Amino acid sequence: MSQYVDLGKMPESPEERRNLIEQRVTMEDYVSHLEITHIQRRVLEFLILQKGYTQEDIEVNKEFKVQLGDISFDVMADVVLKVDGKRFLVIKCAINSLDSWERHSVAFCRVVDTYRIPYAVITDGDQARMLDALSGQLLTEGLDTIPSREKAQQIVREVNFSPLPNDKHEREKRILHAFDAIKCPATPTGLDQT
């Protein structure tokens, strides 16, 4: 009995079919070795199979250290897209309430690197909201609106990767730190466990 395998598109030739199957097997092998959520898995499959990104273009669970005065804290990006040596898009995988993560994602993109990462996406694996992290404005909605690798290369050539002005840097770090402080604990606390 044969099994249906989603190749992302209908192959136009036996050679293309072989290439798509090879790409799918490579992606499955890559994803199977990562400690990721089901949403991250769906996003990675989409990026690799539908948008043409390679493993080298994708950083998963990437940690960044942020210094805020005397406080140092770590923040993590669920998925980062990096093309031609530049991080240009950060993806936040959220279970629900995508719009509640917009401000966090914008602050994240503005302060975690030596330059402002220009775009942020918040997704639950089905829906997505893409933001211009420089202005904070919503650009598009829908997973399909994430740029392809080819389009990303064009974006990277056209965008000015400049740092956030110093007078705004501390404010964005404080916003990021506030979101970091309200994370839910991994285990229940304060509950009577008898």
Predicted regions: what they are:
Residues 2-118, 129, 134-194:
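A short, conserved, highly charged catalytic patch centered on acidic carboxylates
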Residues 123-128:
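Short beta-alpha junction loops
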